[in-house]
């Protein structure tokens, strides 16, 4: 069973911030699949299908690993079937990257997931948000109007890639993503 987790911070205060692009991708993915996040735990919300789970932690970003660990243990999911979607300041707005391993790159939600899963071998779809002067203030602010079209396009493409991934292998998904990379 595949587990796809979109990272973000809970609450209306953070809903439109750069740090919540993982939530945005999951929301669009669920909408495209006509699904709703109808299951809830203390640490998050999710929707379970026979072959996959879409999940959003409702803890703050730096505690995202608690919910991921909870779902992995309860549903006996192998970390090889886990994919995390999150914001990355190392990529420009409008860029995205799929990785199979690596450090958290300063992203605290991903760092907590790596800590809880005890491995860096976690698939991830990183959504570029560019870099600001003060990282904390920057990620907790909305995109500039000039970036709205780019971020909307990359969120759409990310959701489409995940739809493809749900019924294909990760390798096939990477090949398709890389073939279309210049379009994102």
UniProtKB/Swiss-Prot annotation:
Which Gene Ontology terms of cellular component type are present? Answer: cytoplasm
Q: Kindly state which keywords UniProt assigns to this record, in alphabetical order.
A: Cytoplasm, Hydrolase, RNA-binding, tRNA-binding
Q: Give me any GO biological process, just one.
A: rescue of stalled ribosome
InterPro entries linked: Pept_tRNA_hydro (IPR001328), Pept_tRNA_hydro_CS (IPR018171), Pept_tRNA_hydro_sf (IPR036416)
- Compartments in which it is found: Cytoplasm
Q: Under which EC number(s) is this enzyme classified?
A: 3.1.1.29
Which family does the record claim for this protein? Belongs to the PTH family.
NCBIfam families, A to Z: pth
What is this protein's name?
A: Peptidyl-tRNA hydrolase
């Amino acid at each position: 069973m595949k587990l796809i987790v979109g990272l973000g911070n809970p609450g209306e205060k953070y809903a439109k911030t750069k740090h919540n692009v993982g939530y945005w991708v999951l929301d669009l993915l669920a909408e495209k699949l006509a699904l709703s996040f109808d299951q809830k735990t203390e640490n998050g919300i999710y929707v379970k299908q026979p072959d996959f789970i879409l999940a959003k932690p409702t803890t703050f970003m730096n505690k995202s690993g608690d919910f991921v660990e909870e779902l992995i243990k309860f549903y006996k999911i192998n970390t090889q079937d886990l994919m995390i979607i999150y914001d990355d300041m190392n990529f420009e707005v409008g860029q995205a990257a799929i990785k199979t391993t690596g450090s958290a790159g300063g992203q605290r939600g991903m760092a907590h997931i790596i800590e809880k899963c005890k491995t860096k071998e976690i698939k991830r779809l990183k959504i570029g948000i560019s870099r600001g002067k003060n990282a904390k203030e920057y990620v907790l602010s909305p995109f500039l109007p000039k970036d709205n079209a780019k971020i909307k396009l990359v969120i759409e493409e990310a959701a489409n890639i995940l739809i493809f991934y749900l019924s294909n292998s990760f390798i096939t998904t990477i090949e398709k993503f890389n073939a279309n990379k210049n379009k994102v």
